[in-house]
């Protein structure tokens, strides 16, 4: 959680964007952003993240105000930790960090549900 490595943070951000989509679309969701964008986001973030963030803004509008605030805070915290633009390409070791960040963030989501 305290890791500031850019690929790790991008993985965490991807997980949050996925959760926003899942909550906004609910049972209407056939294909998730993970199905469609995971590999591209992990290899060429600069070409994918602007699109994903625009989609998230549309999805946020469908949520209750409380969930909008919750996710906006998460997005602001994660994006605020990015120290540069989205990278053009991630190396294989960086892709590994992306995957770890994604699954750490996803696990945190499931852990919170279990505790509730």
Where are each of the predicted segments found?
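Intrinsic-disorder/low-complexity detector
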Residues: 1-116
